[in-house]
């Protein structure tokens, strides 16, 4: 891995039992004997299982340095180092011949090699772009490709090998040769099914490496084996720009060649420390150690997994990576000890992330801030906080609108103060900003009203349990309950993660009810069932709850069940709006329910409605309603909020409503002004049911289409009004804007 301060992600092992190696070998021997008189072709292609898989691990040579040499060919034959801060994070082989090593201090590298050419590699953009080009190229050979950082990929060639073997004739199978090296110079048995499969895999691996060089100018090593663990280990035996195939009989030889258990991919720093405390240092120690004692110390699943890894057993599948599930930018440094310095670094990281969001096209819905405090230990612990991104900010992300910088920096600094007591001395060595929960919104080309009436997004995209992987982050394999402490602040909106290496990249959302759970016969009068089905589930619940309360309270009740729901029901009926009196006090209660957040733990900054500017739209609607209550004549109504409820739902979801780009206050509150210096006053009269919002200019008069209620129109948020006007204009409706 080439990224500064980041270790390779562990592959991990599956917990499923593999078939016994000796029994499988005997079975193969029986198959070979029975088929010896039938020719080789008939015995090939047994049912694929763990032992018959063909996995390739591709590892690019000095990746960052190669990208720099491709960019500037004059550097090709010179000793080259890629510098990040005070370290040479990687160097080409010319520099390595002269004594320069990866992660060497710049000063030491210059002493070793005075003619060393250094290039700045702190901007990862070009490396990232080239990395994805490599992955896309490998996907042309097999669709099952798993990224491991920038410079490594796993490719599952099992199906491709199957197809090639089916195309070969019997005499051609006997002439199959290996491409590259065979580990330990083991002899090849062309009557062995597994040998033939791995040989074909080596030929495909050679084709992939040739394509990488011809199309991208990159060289790399490859390892061909029956699982990810062995493929990764064997790929580094012959370097650079070479490949090696591992036959099953040499598996134990490769495993025992490792000098220490921490060289086994999948065994991290903490687990290695625990094993060392038990007297386990070598692979053989781990193989022969008592399973019961190991399970007692590490837990059953971890103990079984790492003991299987020590025998070279790894059932973990190659996981199709697809688009990245998160974007992160990080910066490591010797010392950051002031809030101003931290803010400057966060702004730099955020600017880079915003560019990546523009290029990707998806919109992140969660932001995470990660810090690393100074520690004398070799492996530092990381802490993180994350929270949802307000919908009005999401609307601007990816549009190139840098007005989003200010609210995003505000959010990140609030997260920062929840981890760091800025009133006390602190010493940080790393800051990282991560955008996750990326969603490709189909509404990007649709109007806001279209979004309300379109079929709802799949449950997996809006709710349920999501797992987001940070591919460049090292995740320990120690039991999660021992390793990670996730505590939710009282608000439930900010998630805290503390790990030895990196945050656990998981976000939980409340599970939505299926639409079919709601009886359509209980809908309020005037509500179209088909339109109702397309509404977000929480709005459906609100409408139904209002209907239910109306039924039980009776006609003589003073309360009005659908006060805050009038904005929703206005989409169904004109008349219904005029029949419902309004009590702003109800809405105020609901608004406070959204904005108020319990204070944080002692020593950190509190999150409250006054400091959380990002929890509402650009104007503070709760504050506005408070002031309006002082000035307006308000009829008495129930003290209990009647319309907008967040009970029995995850605050992470409910605090920012499911409507995109609109806050709940914007949708359900009365639009309060058309001029920043002027407030309109609601009256108790019939006309006061909706505020008398004027067109943007006193010289403009809008003539609406015949089926549009002007009162309902002026109830909509300004962004929706503008979009409707634009849509009507494009559609050539019978409306016009007159100028006096």
Curated annotation (Swiss-Prot):
Reactions catalysed, as given in the entry: DNA(n) + a 2'-deoxyribonucleoside 5'-triphosphate = DNA(n+1) + diphosphate
Protein's GO biological process: DNA repair; DNA replication; error-prone translesion synthesis; translesion synthesis
UmuC domain segment(s): 55-268
Biased composition (Basic and acidic residues): 672-702
Cofactor dependency: Mg(2+); Mn(2+)
Stretches for region DNA-binding: 249-314, 325-439
Pfam family, one: IMS_HHH_1
Highest rank taxon of the organism: Eukaryota
Recorded domain comment: The catalytic core consists of fingers, palm and thumb subdomains, but the fingers and thumb subdomains are much smaller than in high-fidelity polymerases; residues from five sequence motifs of the Y-family cluster around an active site cleft that can accommodate DNA and nucleotide substrates with relaxed geometric constraints, with consequently higher rates of misincorporation and low processivity.
Protein name: DNA polymerase iota
């Amino acid at each position: 891995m080439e990224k500064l301060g980041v270790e390779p992600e562990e592959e991990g092992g599956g917990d499923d039992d593999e078939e016994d190696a000796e029994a499988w070998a005997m079975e193969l021997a029986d198959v070979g004997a029975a088929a010896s008189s039938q020719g080789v072709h008939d015995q090939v292609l047994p049912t694929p299982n763990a032992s018959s898989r063909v996995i390739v691990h591709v590892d690019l040579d000095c990746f960052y340095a190669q990208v720099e040499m491709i960019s500037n060919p004059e550097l090709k034959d010179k000793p080259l180092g890629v510098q990040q801060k005070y370290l040479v994070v990687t160097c080409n082989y010319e520099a390595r011949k002269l004594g320069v090593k990866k992660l060497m201090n710049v000063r030491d590298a210059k002493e070793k090699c005075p003619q060393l050419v250094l290039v700045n590699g702190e901007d990862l953009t070009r490396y990232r772009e080239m990395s994805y080009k490599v992955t896309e190229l490998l996907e042309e050979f097999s669709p099952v490709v798993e990224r491991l950082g920038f410079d490594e990929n796993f490719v599952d060639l099992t199906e491709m090998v199957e197809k090639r073997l089916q195309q070969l004739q019997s005499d051609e199978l006997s002439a199959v040769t290996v491409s590259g090296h065979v580990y330990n110079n083991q002899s090849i048995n062309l009557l062995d099914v597994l040998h033939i499969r791995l040989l074909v895999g080596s030929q495909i691996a050679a084709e992939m490496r040739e394509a990488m060089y011809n199309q991208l100018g990159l060289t790399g090593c490859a390892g061909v084996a029956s699982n990810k663990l062995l493929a990764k280990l064997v790929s580094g035996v012959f370097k650079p720009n070479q490949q090696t195939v591992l036959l099953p009989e040499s598996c134990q030889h490769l495993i025992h060649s490792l000098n220490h258990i921490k060289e086994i991919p999948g065994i991290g720093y903490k687990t290695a420390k625990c094993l060392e405390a038990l007297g386990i240092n070598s692979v053989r120690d781990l193989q022969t150690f008592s399973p019961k004692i190991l399970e007692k110390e590490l837990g059953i699943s971890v103990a079984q997994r790492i003991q299987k890894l020590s025998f070279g057993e790894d059932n973990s599948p190659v996981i199709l990576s697809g688009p990245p599930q998160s974007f992160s930018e990080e910066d490591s440094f010797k010392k950051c000890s002031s809030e101003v310095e931290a803010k400057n670094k966060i702004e730099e990281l955020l600017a880079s992330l915003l560019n990546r969001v523009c290029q990707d096209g998806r919109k992140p819905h969660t932001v995470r801030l990660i810090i690393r405090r100074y520690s004398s230990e070799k492996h530092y612990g990381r802490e993180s906080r994350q929270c949802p991104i307000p919908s009005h900010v999401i609307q601007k992300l990816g549009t190139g609108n840098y007005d989003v910088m200010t609210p995003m920096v505000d959010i990140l600094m609030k997260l920062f103060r929840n981890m760091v007591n800025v009133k006390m001395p602190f010493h940080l060595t790393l800051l990282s900003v991560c955008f996750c929960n990326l969603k490709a919104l189909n509404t990007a080309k649709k109007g806001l009203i279209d979004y309300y009436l379109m079929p709802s997004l799949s449950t997996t995209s809006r709710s349920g349990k999501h797992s987001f992987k940070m591919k460049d982050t090292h995740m320990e394999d120690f039991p999660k309950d021992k390793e990670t402490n996730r505590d939710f602040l009282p608000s439930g909106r900010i998630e805290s993660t503390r790990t030895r290496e990196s945050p656990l990249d998981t976000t939980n959302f409340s599970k939505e009810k299926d639409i079919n759970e709601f009886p359509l016969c209980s809908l309020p009068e005037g509500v179209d069932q088909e339109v109702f089905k397309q509404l977000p589930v929480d709005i459906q619940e609100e409408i139904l709850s209002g209907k239910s309360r109306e039924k039980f309270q009776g006609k003589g009740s003073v309360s009005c069940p659908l006060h805050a729901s009038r904005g929703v029901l206005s989409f169904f009926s004109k008349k219904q709006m005029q029949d419902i009196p309004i009590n702003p006090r109800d809405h105020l209660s609901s608004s406070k329910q959204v904005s108020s957040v319990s204070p944080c733990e002692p020593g950190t900054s509190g999150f409250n409605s006054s400091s959380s500017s990002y929890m509402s739209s650009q104007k503070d609607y709760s504050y506005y309603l408070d002031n309006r209550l002082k000035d307006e004549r308000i009829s008495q109504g129930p003290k209990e909020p009647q319309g907008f409820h967040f009970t029995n739902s995850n605050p992470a979801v409910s605090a920012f409503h499911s409507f995109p780009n609109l806050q709940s206050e914007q949708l359900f509150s009365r639009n309060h002004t058309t001029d920043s210096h002027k407030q309109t006053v609601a009256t108790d009269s019939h006309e006061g049911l909706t505020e008398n919002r004027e067109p943007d200019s006193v010289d403009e008069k809008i003539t609406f289409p015949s089926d549009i209620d002007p009162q309902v129109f002026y109830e909509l948020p300004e962004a929706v009004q503008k979009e409707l006007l634009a849509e009507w204009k494009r559609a050539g409706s019978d409306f016009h804007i007159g100028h006096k």
